[in-house]
C-alpha cells in the first residue's frame, strides 16, 4: 500500500483539529449512490478529498468517477472537478478542482457515490475525506 504524504502533511498542519472519514472496497467498485454515509459531529469544513485505487478496472474508454455529497447534494458544483481515474489506470484519482461546498455543521450527512465506472470498476479503492473542526 502506498503511503499518502498529502495526508501526513495535513496531519502536521491541522493537528488535533483534523477529522478523517475513510472507506475501503477490496472488490471492484460499482455505480451506486450513498456507498457510505457519515453523520458530522462537529462544525468545520472539508479540506480535501483523496481517492486511490491499487487495482485496474476495465479497459473501455470511461473513467471511474466519484462524487461526494453533503446532505444529498454534491460538493462539486462544477461536475468536471469530481475525482476521476482514467480507464485502465491505477493510483490517485485526479481532481480538476477542489470542491466548492465545504462548510460542515453538526448533524450534516456526508456520503460518497460512484457515478461512473469503466466496464469493471477499479479494485482496492480507498476514499479519504479530510476535514477540519472549528
What are these regions (language model features)?
Residues 1-9, 42-45, 63, 98-105, ...:
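Surface-exposed receptor/substrate recognition regions of extracellular proteins
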Residues 1-30, 47, 69, 73-88, ...:
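Glycine-rich, low-complexity segments
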Residues 6, 32, 38, 93-96:
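Short, functionally important structural connectors and interaction interfaces within domains
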Residues 11-14, 37, 83, 106, ...:
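Positively charged, low-complexity intrinsically disordered regions
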Residues 23, 33-69, 110-113, 126-132:
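Beta-rich globular "head" domains
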Residues 24-28, 35-38, 98-102:
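Beta-strand-rich interaction surfaces with strong enrichment in secreted/lumenal proteins
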Residues 54-106:
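Terminal beta-strand-rich extracellular "head" domains
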Residues 116-120:
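Short, charged beta-turn/beta-strand-edge "cap" motif at the junction between a beta-strand
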